[in-house]
A protein has these predicted regions:
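Outer-membrane beta-barrel translocator domains and adjoining extracellular loop/strand segments
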Residues: 1-3, 44-51, 100-108, 150-157, ...
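Surface-exposed strand-loop-strand hairpins of Gram-negative outer-membrane beta-barrel proteins
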Residues: 1-17
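Residues that define the transmembrane beta-barrel architecture of outer-membrane proteins
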Residues: 14-18, 57, 65-71, 85, ...
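Residues on the lipid-exposed face of transmembrane beta-strands in outer-membrane beta-barrel proteins
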Residues: 20-24, 34, 73-77, 91-93, ...
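Transmembrane beta-strands of outer-membrane beta-barrel proteins
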Residues: 32-34, 73, 85-91, 123, ...
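Transmembrane beta-barrel strands of outer-membrane/channel proteins
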Residues: 34-38, 89-95, 131, 140-144, ...
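Outer membrane beta-barrel transmembrane domains
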Residues: 81, 156-254
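Detector for outer-membrane/organellar transmembrane beta-barrel domains
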Residues: 112-193
């Protein structure tokens, strides 16, 4: 739903990631990219007496996973329509290399949503376009991941589709910035080969601000702050009040 409810167990999840992106332009209109996400996930909560047989008297309970997540490979082709509107079409695949067998301190496998990998190979599709408006750039895109089936533990992640609109100012050589409005829609997950997983799926709207600097002609640094505008999620789910991201981009010469 879209209402806040008490978090009696004081549960929280810290999800940190470092993504290395490598792109190579085969031609001016055809590019291949690889995304390598290194992830660290820490979930912690306070259990009441009897909630967990391994910690019967209650207390703090931690679950964590870390390592290289699922690698994404993508090919993008750019075409111009109506003599001036560039359209970038992307097609790729999410690999299943990330670990999905991390355990807690008692040797019990932690839930699929806390693993760094998914255990399935899924296609990813995207379409993106941009248009210069004086000193601004207006852009937008749609990105989707289609779940193809269950992993070896019988868990199937829901499909995801994300729509976003950006307005960026890039005229200044040293500083640039922009805002983004995005919508994320996720369908339900399934476990044990077909059972509906509660507390998963729903839709969210976000507002994101961005600021960056061009340190050199080849090197950029960037920071983004994302805040939820509205969230309508299935059952009860943990939500984040904001997300901060730091990034850098280096352009290699040819």
């Amino acid at each position: 739903g879209d209402r806040f409810i008490p978090n009696y167990n004081k549960e929280r999840t810290n999800n940190s990631s470092l993504t290395i992106i490598s792109s190579y332009g085969i031609t001016d209109h055809f590019t291949i990219s690889a995304f390598f996400p290194f992830r660290y996930i820490l979930n912690q909560k306070v259990l009441f007496r009897g909630q967990n047989p391994n910690l019967y008297n209650g207390g703090k309970y931690f679950r964590e996973s870390y390592g290289l997540g699922d690698v994404l490979l993508q090919a993008r082709i750019q075409r111009t329509f109506f003599n001036e509107i560039p359209i970038v079409l992307g097609i790729g695949v999410k690999l299943s290399n990330g670990k999905i067998n991390m355990t807690d301190e008692f040797g019990e496998r932690i839930s699929d949503n806390l693993q760094v990998g998914t255990g399935t190979v899924d296609p990813i599709l995207s379409i993106y376009s941009s248009q210069d408006i004086k000193k601004l750039v207006l852009s937008g895109g749609v990105f989707t991941r289609i779940s193809t089936g269950e992993n070896i533990y019988g868990y199937k992640y829901g499909n995801e589709i994300q729509t976003l609109i950006n307005l960026d100012y890039i005229e200044n050589h040293l500083l640039y910035g922009g805002v983004q409005v995005s919508h994320l829609l996720s369908t339900r997950d399934y476990y044990e080969y077909g059972k509906i997983s509660r507390d998963r799926g729903g839709e969210s709207y976000f507002l994101t601000g961005k600021i960056g600097t061009k340190a050199t002609d080849n090197l950029d640094f960037e920071m983004t702050l994302q805040m939820p505008l509205h969230q309508n999620l299935n059952e009860s789910q943990l939500v984040s009040p904001f997300i901060i991201q730091f990034g850098s981009l280096y352009r290699f010469g040819t």
